[in-house]
């Protein structure tokens, strides 16, 4: 039995249920319970908090989160093969784990969880970025979550915390740093996973700010930033031409030289541009 709980080691679990990670679902399983406990601790004190977990797989992180004191976990798993392993965990922690077989993009966490809510997940690589952008761009702020503790490929993690002027700086950095404090909390080598991915991974911890750093409409900012970085080597007057016929006027109003390139523009200045566009 595991030291974390009275459940079998994860290698035994995946053997019993004949589980193997599927590339089509972006899966890589974490089977070291000491490591999943360490990741769970990055989410902070979970006592009195509900937790949303996406893609729990055989439940390694789930077990870590429960042992760290999560009040209740909503685990959304698309892969039906993993459900029996998760139901075993639910039986060991009565009333504290709800498992839904479905797509995280289609499920409202607030229908199942009670604030305060934290999100912790070894995100499937094929939906991780889309989920993060969605969590960072709701119309209303603060969001349903207090914090996000998320596993990404190292390259994606570096894009979230990147600063202007760096190659990694782009849409993710701007949206994350506009409304949250973001830091890389933990690095993991490929060998931590089964099967080992070709690249290293990292855990990013984001804490929601009470209000955005600068005023801006989320939808407008998101559209502007996406257009600007879609052609990041072009001058903004060219890359943003499709956003507004008067884009040079809006850039000047925001104090941004129209000849500037996207990677040189700060979060504050992108927000000023979004406000100018909103005024029309």
UniProtKB/Swiss-Prot annotation:
GO terms for molecular function: 16S rRNA (adenine(1518)-N(6)/adenine(1519)-N(6))-dimethyltransferase activity; RNA binding. InterPro entries: KsgA/Erm, rRNA_Ade_diMease-like_C, rRNA_Ade_Mease_Trfase_CS, rRNA_Ade_methylase_Trfase_N, rRNA_adenine_dimethylase, SAM-dependent_MTases_sf. SMART domains: rADc. S-adenosyl-L-methionine binds at residues 28, 30, 55, 77, 103, 122. Its main location: cytoplasm. Keywords: Cytoplasm, Methyltransferase, RNA-binding, rRNA processing, S-adenosyl-L-methionine, Transferase. CDD domains: AdoMet_MTases. Its EC number is 2.1.1.182. GO terms for cellular component: cytosol. It catalyses: adenosine(1518)/adenosine(1519) in 16S rRNA + 4 S-adenosyl-L-methionine = N(6)-dimethyladenosine(1518)/N(6)-dimethyladenosine(1519) in 16S rRNA + 4 S-adenosyl-L-homocysteine + 4 H(+). The keyword S-adenosyl-L-methionine applies. The keyword Membrane does not apply. It holds the Pfam family RrnaAD. It is found in: Cytoplasm. Specifically dimethylates two adjacent adenosines (A1518 and A1519) in the loop of a conserved hairpin near the 3'-end of 16S rRNA in the 30S particle. May play a critical role in biogenesis of 30S subunits. Belongs to the class I-like SAM-binding methyltransferase superfamily. rRNA adenine N(6)-methyltransferase family. RsmA subfamily. This is Ribosomal RNA small subunit methyltransferase A. It comes from Ruegeria sp. (strain TM1040) (Silicibacter sp.).
